[in-house]
Amino acid sequence: MTSYIKSGLYLIGFMTLSTLASAQFSTDSKSPVTGSADDVDYRPNLTIFSGQVDVRQGDVRILSDKMRVHTTNGASGSDSIDGAHKIEAIGNFYYLTPDQEVRGHQGIYLKSTETFTVTGDVVLLQGDGNVVTGDRLVYNLTDGTAIVNGTCKGRKCGSKGRVNILLKNTSN
């Protein structure tokens, strides 16, 4: 029984961390954070959400097959939300807003660098029709910069493995 209560409390704490991590992404960071998964496995310093993970805040939605929240023990020896240092969303990763969709194999948030990295067949779709594809996208939450990398360098690769960009004509 205590395990279920602790898991429930940790889920609330995780959602609070998600609010902080996604505040830069969400247009409504004061909205409540909701989440669901088929299973939650709580361990010291690690909580694993498995099976159709769905986290929402305002108009932002994150989907994945599995999500791992890594923490460091707090001063009192119990897991503290302040100690969460890494969030991994693994398998069929989607980051969705009304104006943008990012998808890839996985997304990783690192508190130490304030970065959000998406890897594996990354596709960034913008509402205006622009598309960027690559193998890796790194978004810096502090300064708002983004870097997209491919797996192949040079013209000999063609478009396979390189960063590809499609910009829609905005002129009338």
Task: Mark where each language-model region is.
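Mature-chain termini and adjacent capping regions
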Residues: 1-172
